[in-house]
Amino acid sequence: MANISLVALLLVTCLYVTYGKINGSHDLKVGKRGFNDVLLFQKTVSKSNWKPWGTVSEDVSFPVKKEYGLKIVITEIDAFDLDKDDKGGYAYITEGGVNYNNVTIHFKSQKGLGFNFEVTIYGHYY
């Protein structure tokens, strides 16, 4: 039984490593939108890097400014890496997120490279 589990684990690991390298994107997709959700925010976030060993980063927040009386719930957050050749950056949620009314996403490049992401946030008003 342990041998079967080990073989299954190795197979899954090999498939993950193989297809991860073929795809080469660093997409972030959190949550799932429902039938009554609307597009709340959309933005292209890109930054180039002129330092050969340095990295660049940027934070994107929604809502952009604090709007009092705005009652929303975020249901899906997508940050799609537009550089599909494994040379793009990485996206992390650092504050808020799904089931919150706000989110902050931190983007960071790989060393010596920039990044290019398309960010979309879906949710609904209540």
Task: Identify the role of each PLM range.
Residues 114-125:
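Short, structured beta-strand segments at or near domain termini in extracellular proteins/domains
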Residues 58-108:
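Extracellular attachment/recognition segments
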